[in-house]
């Protein structure tokens, strides 16, 4: 099985699992997916994640977070797509949903939130937005 957009598949699995009210979901392992999950955990959007290996295929098990029986993640969407990449300079990075959400950006200094990218004055590829 080949994926043309691994990050898009990763985000869709999380979105679908949240809408179906699952406690956890399994996504394919990659360094970028792991970095995004680290940010989501730090920002309080998920409970936890861990790497597991079944049949020599590494994957990440994500424990989803809910508040009053509704998903904490209201919207998670891909911004930069394989067919249309979206790059932003540090001064052009806006706040997601007027500061209520986050953009996750891949920079030369690693994957980080929009707030950290503005603070460190680095730009990069805007991977996704989370609200």
From Swiss-Prot:
Any one Gene Ontology cellular component term annotated for this protein: ribonucleoprotein complex
GO molecular function: rRNA binding; structural constituent of ribosome
One Pfam family in the UniProt entry: Ribosomal_S8
Coiled-coil parts of chain: none
An example Gene Ontology biological process: translation
Ribonucleoprotein is among the record's keywords: yes
Keyword Acyltransferase: no
UniProt KW keywords: Ribonucleoprotein, Ribosomal protein, RNA-binding, rRNA-binding
InterPro entries to which the protein is assigned, alphabetical: Ribosomal_uS8 (IPR000630), Ribosomal_uS8_CS (IPR047863), Ribosomal_uS8_sf (IPR035987)
Gene3D superfamilies named in the record: 3.30.1370.30, 3.30.1490.10
Record's function text: One of the primary rRNA binding proteins, it binds directly to 16S rRNA central domain where it helps coordinate assembly of the platform of the 30S subunit.
Assembly and binders: Part of the 30S ribosomal subunit. Contacts proteins S5 and S12.
Similarity comment: Belongs to the universal ribosomal protein uS8 family.
PANTHER family to which the protein is assigned, alphabetical: 40S RIBOSOMAL PROTEIN S15A
Protein known as: Small ribosomal subunit protein uS8
Organism in which the protein naturally occurs: Wolbachia pipientis subsp. Culex pipiens (strain wPip)
